[in-house]
From Swiss-Prot:
Function in brief: SNAREs, soluble N-ethylmaleimide-sensitive factor-attachment protein receptors, are essential proteins for fusion of cellular membranes. SNAREs localized on opposing membranes assemble to form a trans-SNARE complex, an extended, parallel four alpha-helical bundle that drives membrane fusion. SNAP29 is a SNARE involved in autophagy through the direct control of autophagosome membrane fusion with the lysososome membrane. Also plays a role in ciliogenesis by regulating membrane fusions.
Membrane topology: Peripheral membrane protein
GO cellular component: autophagosome; autophagosome membrane; azurophil granule membrane; centrosome; ciliary pocket membrane; cytoplasm; cytosol; Golgi membrane
Gene name linked to the record: SNAP29
Record's protein name: Synaptosomal-associated protein 29
Stored InterPro entries: T_SNARE_dom
SUPFAM superfamilies according to UniProt: SNARE fusion complex
Organism: Homo sapiens (Human)
Gene Ontology BP annotations: autophagosome maturation; autophagosome membrane docking; cilium assembly; exocytosis; membrane fusion; protein transport; synaptic vesicle fusion to presynaptic active zone membrane; synaptic vesicle priming
Gene3D superfamilies registered for this protein in UniProt: 1.20.5.110
Keyword line: Autophagy, Cell membrane, Cell projection, Cilium, Cilium biogenesis/degradation, Coiled coil, Cytoplasm, Cytoplasmic vesicle, Golgi apparatus, Ichthyosis, Membrane, Neuropathy, Palmoplantar keratoderma, Phosphoprotein, Protein transport, Transport
Nucleus listed as a keyword: no
Domain of life from the UniProt record: Eukaryota
Record-listed Phosphothreonine modification sites: T130, T137
Length: 258
């Protein structure tokens, strides 16, 4: 004789403690005994499997939406890093220009110190105009790794928006995009058309999640490289600013001594 009541839900066994009593069937008819009991039990199991498949498909769709949202945030942060790189490079160029101008000023001051040599040196050694650096004429670009990651994510985002308008929910009228399960044999899916559609949707979402996580990884690695390169720029800029500050103070002292 069975140790369980005649009506219990085997799906609830996994979530129960060993000492807990089996949960009763959550069915209006409570699966009464009779000649139709096996058929009723089988029908309930089909409905339960279908319900859980639907919930899983909806869960993977939500996860996919969150993944794409995270990717958008990553792209926006990467683009902000690229703009910051441009600011740093322009600042470094301005500091270099200030240093060149200061050197010219120091030459003039040294020339003025000598009454006779001043005029001769002034006209003899005119300030040499330094040609603008080629980097200053180009638009600042992030490192290639980050640039490719941003481009790939933007292309995929456009495809996602086209194929997932308003994060459309899976239902009986729109079970799954055609061809979503083409990569697998149809024998691998259940014969029930609705259940098959849910399984195909789940597989499609998981495939997209896998590729999306790969793109997120590329963005993260690209941002890491970009931050390291910008740290190098900051180190150079700090050194140049400190040197410029010393030269400015030295020039001020020379001017006061005139």
């Amino acid at each position: 004789m069975s140790a369980y009541p005649k009506s219990y839900n085997p799906f609830d066994d996994d979530g129960e403690d060993e000492g807990a009593r089996p949960a009763p069937w959550r069915d209006a008819r409570d699966l009464p005994d009779g000649p139709d009991a096996p058929a009723d039990r089988q029908q309930y199991l089909r409905q339960e499997v279908l319900r859980r498949a639907e919930a899983t498909a909806a869960s993977t769709s939500r996860s996919l939406a969150l993944m794409y949202e995270s990717e958008k945030v990553g792209v926006a942060s990467s683009e902000e890093l690229a703009r910051q790189r441009g600011v740093l490079e322009r600042t470094e160029k301005m500091v270099d220009k200030m240093d060149q101008d200061l050197k010219i000023s120091q030459k003039h001051i040294n020339s003025i110190k000598s009454v006779f040599g001043g005029l001769v040196n002034y006209f003899k050694s005119k300030p040499v105009e330094t040609p603008p650096e080629q980097n200053g004429t180009l638009t600042s670009q992030p490192n290639n790794r980050l640039k490719e990651a941003i481009s790939t994510s933007k292309e995929q985002e456009a495809k996602y928006q086209a194929s997932h308008p308003n994060l459309r929910k899976l239902d009986d009228t729109d079970p799954v995009p055609r061809g979503a399960g083409s990569a697998m044999s149809t024998d691998a899916y259940p014969k029930n058309p609705h259940l098959r559609a849910y399984h195909q949707k789940i597989d499609s979402n998981l495939d997209e999640l896998s590729m999306g996580l790969g793109r997120l990884k590329d963005i993260a690695l690209g941002m890491q490289t970009e931050i390291e390169e910008q740290d190098d720029i900051l180190d150079r800029l700090t050194t140049k600013v400190d040197k410029l500050d010393v030269n400015i103070k030295s020039t001020e002292r020379k001017v006061r001594q005139l």
